[in-house]
Amino acid sequence: MSAEYDLTIIGGGPVGMFAAFYAGMRNARVQLLESLPELGGQVQALYPEKIIHDVAGYPAIKGRELVAQLEKQLTQFPIDIQLASPVTDVTGAMGDFTITTASGQQSHSKAIIVATGSGAFEPRRLAVDNAAEFENKQLFYHIPSVKQFADRTVLVAGGGDSAIDMALMLEPVAKHVYIMHRRDRFRGMEHNVDLLKASSVEIKTPFLIKQLAETATGQLQLTMKEVRGTTEETLAVDDLIVNYGFIADNKVIRNWHVTPTMAHRLITVDTEMNTDVPGIAAIGDTVTYAGKLGLIASGFGEAPNAVNQLMMTLYPERRSPLHSTTVFEKM
């Protein structure tokens, strides 16, 4: 049986979407499989309102807007997109891989690019006994829109770029914003930290939340304890947003019959994004190699590399890739 697709991209986050588009430019028969009901991966599911500053050509763009632009880019080619289709198994070999999804549907592909990001993800939850009582009421781990916090007092817990970005996004919308971190120094990029310090966001360091309670007026009362100290403070807020990061795992890949070698839950690749399984490449946050940066911008560079090396392996008689202007002049 001949393979239905030249390339199957497993993972429909921004990097997987760009890989599918670029494969379309190479006239490949492309399938894009995404486990979630919509494209965009973690950016769409967790950070739709986050302002992204490190994508070339965009001084600033919201996560959802970046995904929308990538979707628009995809429509230029006949990409077969399958949503809500987590891949449960891969069998076969280069030239005819069989890919099985959770619904039992099978497809055949000559080669595969894995772009599953960090895999399945769960937020690192607040380690307070009664925290679950307040989840999705006054305690949030990710939010669909900052508008829900208009004219409210909000505390953001966390010390990385995501927490800082969230606090800065809330600043013009909320009545008052606090940010609390367990260390005196934030882990975010220097420019973001400078913006935070220059903003009206009130900084609480070095503190950890120890207790949650509801006040008589319906607010959320936080009891905060100084790290390596004895000071305790209480603070009443309308909402608490916890940005402690996510616990991610690509364990589903380890259950495939054809499994690339992994190191610390990430797939190891060479300079051409090849795994140790012929015909399977991997890109984005799912991979590790010397000098790897966990940036969307890095993944956008890895995608054409992976597509080109697989297409040249499958179709050595084809010409080397052309510049995009040449491709679109013919359309």
Swiss-Prot record:
Reactions catalysed: 2 reduced [2Fe-2S]-[ferredoxin] + NADP(+) + H(+) = 2 oxidized [2Fe-2S]-[ferredoxin] + NADPH
EC number, UniProt record: 1.18.1.2
GO molecular function, one term: ferredoxin-NADP+ reductase activity
Residues at which FAD binds: 34, 42, 47, 87, 121, 285, 325
Keyword hit for Flavoprotein: yes
Record InterPro entries: FAD/NAD-bd_sf, FAD/NAD-binding_dom, Fd--NADP_Rdtase_type_2, Ferredoxin-NADP_redctase_2
Cofactor note: Binds 1 FAD per subunit.
Gene3D superfamilies, sorted: FAD/NAD(P)-binding domain
Required cofactor(s): FAD
Disulfide bond residue pairs: none
Keywords: FAD, Flavoprotein, NADP, Oxidoreductase
Enzyme class: oxidoreductase
Self-association state and partner proteins as the record states: Homodimer.
HAMAP family assigned to the protein according to its UniProt record, in alphabetical order: FENR2
Family: Belongs to the ferredoxin--NADP reductase type 2 family.
Name the record gives this protein: Ferredoxin--NADP reductase
